[in-house]
Amino acid sequence: MKRAENLVRLEHVQEISTSNINYLVYLSFHRELKKAIKSFAKGRLLDIGCGNKPYEIWCSEFVAEYVGCDIIQSSANKVDVLSPANSIPLESSSFNTVLSTQVIEHVEDHQGLVNEAYRLLRKDGYFILSGPLYWNLHEEPYDFFRFTKYGFNHVLEKAGFEVCEVNANGGAWATLGQVINHTFDFKNPKASKMVRGLKYIFRKLRLFVVVNKLFSYLDAKDYNTINTMNYVVVARKK
């Protein structure tokens, strides 16, 4: 199977609504990503794994140019540079900002992606990076890695970056709620008739809305990141 045959890219920014089954991660992920873009995005920006550039709208007021790189052309033909993430045919030290959201887990040579971001950035440029600690399998079989905050620190510092921020997206309660939503949403043909019935009721009654409201409330009342779903990380090229 060719890499492109099972590759999915985000078409647009997902709506933050309790009717979205992934509400619990988007609630905090979007908040932290917007903050990082507002604080650190500037000048020429390269989006590695850009797809249809869903976050360009958030960056437009802060950057002078938005360049997108991906391994295949997107459905809306938004990709400017077609190349692997670890070997991008662009001039060194030519960008002020590099952005890569929810891509690093799909790159087998993830250190190569981080090294390329470092090479392409100008001195004192910023790398805004995000990736999961918890998420269900997706884009199989090209779903290679999950990262703790220590894992992100390691790969960034190994490339030469100074890590500025590592922000968790959701605490333990939000993570538990997201696991519940994913488990009930997954249609497993091997499940027993009883379990399939329970999952059908969960979906039919839209109980994920209840889960989203309850577990976001619990997360706010008992916030801890011993378990979290995702991280938004900012690093500076020294």
Residue map of PLM features:
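Active-site micro-motifs of SAM-dependent methyltransferase domains
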Residues: 73, 87, 105, 135, ...
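Residue-level signal for alpha-helix termini/capping positions
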Residues: 37-38, 122, 157
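Short conserved AdoMet
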Residues: 41, 108, 122
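S-adenosyl-L-methionine-dependent methyltransferase catalytic module, highlighting the catalytic core
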Residues: 19, 108-112, 116, 126-237
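A short beta-strand submotif of the Rossmann-like class I SAM-dependent methyltransferase core
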Residues: 100-103
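Conserved N-terminal segment of class I S-adenosyl-L-methionine
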Residues: 1-93, 97, 114, 224-231, ...
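Residue-level signal for short amphipathic helical patches enriched in basic/charged
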Residues: 40, 105, 147
